[in-house]
């Protein structure tokens, strides 16, 4: 769910392609897309439509732009909605790609902290040396500081959310060690979190002292996300998470666990919270979310509010629970709450200087995807592996009654399986379309990243004020401005004969599609200037110097 799954926008792209070739169409709400997909597959299997064409005309780029610009919004730059599979498939080696394994490691170590601290609980120590375990808990603080501190310099966007998640792990760990939530546990957890934060900076102080931060403030966002667009990106994960939360919410707020009995054959027992006030609050919040969603302005914020209310309720139960699983559930709820907070946060604020809110949504939505992918997988496992029906209950109920009371469970499982299948649409269609979308589609599969140069040329094309070199496939090798096979020869010569890492001097290209840094890219040597816009955007304090280095004239033209 973290690394392989695609979003529902990817399914929408497939539906659009199938709709073009489908002989069946209907305007009935909710059924139109399904009818078109069935008709499209019929045309492929039994008609004249080509499955090959269906695959290779698939728009693999579109799922990374799942959000639309709402009417009346001033900024018209579409936010980026990458997910890890798309990121690795696109293979653009930006910082967010490098940060993914480190971010997941931070979450994993956070869970390790919770489990390690749980073993410090005298009830669960099982004869282990408590002092040694306490020392190891401080070692985990150091490990967290090292990983989270590294994230700040690998991809600074990842630092705040995973610092918060790591702090939550330390506080939950102290609660696990105490066996219950106390002021002492909270104080020690906050103290260890502060130590971790200081260490995360101190361990990389040499980098911090030589680093200039171009963007360091936020501003109010003038863009918001339509709730439907939000669900087209996170819908699969949210469905799985919702089932997990609703089950645990029922255990918390009901006096009689009728949902648990129906789904899992659990025993009836009373709970301390009054059902009516809590249910009234949730219904009111849900109605507000639906109302806000109809105006396409505050739907995501309202969803976050409803979700946070539910998380607080289920977390409150685990704070009081003496069971050994309570700390793990608390950590999972902390991950869920962090994702809700990030989702609502980008609706209200954006990084000052961002292109609209393109990168703010991009980076924080990617965090939400990684965090919620773990929560969804855990929730699915928890519902169907941990909370299975009790055999004694099923024997008493009999075959027919057992099937009836488990019907909701089967329905949830069926929908979950369907959504998991839809999550694989992008890995299949997106991968094949992306591989086909290259300079020379006739090339066989290869690990040689330079193979395209044997049959690809570049030529100048007009783009605004700049003459941009763009690559194109030309099997004849006649019409191109420059044949890249000669560039390949030069690259191979540098690789074989040049020692060290001397700076490569090559023509500046203002567009990232211009291959302007191709020699530096394929040799690994430093260049004088990269893609002009990226350089100016990421070094905004030194924009004039970057422009001068790139040979930029006043008036926007580039000197060749």
Regions found by a protein language model. Name each.
Residues 1, 138, 189-201, 277-285, ...:
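Signature aromatic-anchored transmembrane alpha helix within multi-pass, membrane-resident enzymes
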Residues 110-136, 162-197, 214-225, 241-258, ...:
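Perimembrane helix-loop-helix junctions
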């Amino acid at each position: 769910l973290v690394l392989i799954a695609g979003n529902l926008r990817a399914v929408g792209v497939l539906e659009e392609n199938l709709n073009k070739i489908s002989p069946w169409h209907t305007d009935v709400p909710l059924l139109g897309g399904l009818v078109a997909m069935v008709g499209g597959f019929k045309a492929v299997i039994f008609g004249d439509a080509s499955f090959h064409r269906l695959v290779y005309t698939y728009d693999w780029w579109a799922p990374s732009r799942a959000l639309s610009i709402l009417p009346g919004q001033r900024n018209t730059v579409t936010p980026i909605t990458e997910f890890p599979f798309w990121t690795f498939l696109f293979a653009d080696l930006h910082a967010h790609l490098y940060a993914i394994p480190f971010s997941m490691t931070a979450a994993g170590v956070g869970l390790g902290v919770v489990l390690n601290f749980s073993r410090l609980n005298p009830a669960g120590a099982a004869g282990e040396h408590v002092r040694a375990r306490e020392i190891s808990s401080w070692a985990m603080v150091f490990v967290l500081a090292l990983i989270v501190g590294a994230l700040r310099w690998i991809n600074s966007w990842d630092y705040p959310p995973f610092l918060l998640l790591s702090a939550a792990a330390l506080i939950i760990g102290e609660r696990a060690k105490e066996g219950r939530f106390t002021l002492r546990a909270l104080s020690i957890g906050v103290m260890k979190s502060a130590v971790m934060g200081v260490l995360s900076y101190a361990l990389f102080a040499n980098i911090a002292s030589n680093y200039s931060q171009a963007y360091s403030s936020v501003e109010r966002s003038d863009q918001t996300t339509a709730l439907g667009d939000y669900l087209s990106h996170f819908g699969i994960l949210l469905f799985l998470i919702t089932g997990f939360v609703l089950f645990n919410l029922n255990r918390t707020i009901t006096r009689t666990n009728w949902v648990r009995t129906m789904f899992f054959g659990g025993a009836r027992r009373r709970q301390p919270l009054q059902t009516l006030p809590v249910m009234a609050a949730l219904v009111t919040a849900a109605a507000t979310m639906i109302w806000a969603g109809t105006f396409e302005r505050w739907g995501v914020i309202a969803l976050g509010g409803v979700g946070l209310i539910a998380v607080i309720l289920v977390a409150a139960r685990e704070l009081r629970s003496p069971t050994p699983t309570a700390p793990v559930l608390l950590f999972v709820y902390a991950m869920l709450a962090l994702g809700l907070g990030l989702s609502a946060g980008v609706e209200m604020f954006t990084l000052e200087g961002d292109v609209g809110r393109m990168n703010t949504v991009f980076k924080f939505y990617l965090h939400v995807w990684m965090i919620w992918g773990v929560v969804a997988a855990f929730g699915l496992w928890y519902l169907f592996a941990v909370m299975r029906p009790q055999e004694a209950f099923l024997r008493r109920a009999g075959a027919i009654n057992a099937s009836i009371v488990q019907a909701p469970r089967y329905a949830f499982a069926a929908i979950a399986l369907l959504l998991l299948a839809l999550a694989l649409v992008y890995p299949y269609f997106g991968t094949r379309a992306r591989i086909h979308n290259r300079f020379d589609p006739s090339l066989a599969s290869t690990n040689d990243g330079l193979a395209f140069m044997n049959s690809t040329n570049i030529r100048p094309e007009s783009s605004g004020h700049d003459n941009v070199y763009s690559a194109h496939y030309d099997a004849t090798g006649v019409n191109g401005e420059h044949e890249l096979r000669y560039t390949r020869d030069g690259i191979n010569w540098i690789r074989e004969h040049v020692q060290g890492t001397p700076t490569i001097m090559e023509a500046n290209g203002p567009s990232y599609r211009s291959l302007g840094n191709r020699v530096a890219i394929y040799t690994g040597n430093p260049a004088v200037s990269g893609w002009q816009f990226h350089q100016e955007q990421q070094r905004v304090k030194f924009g004039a110097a970057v422009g001068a280095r790139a040979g930029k004239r006043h008036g926007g033209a580039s000197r060749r």
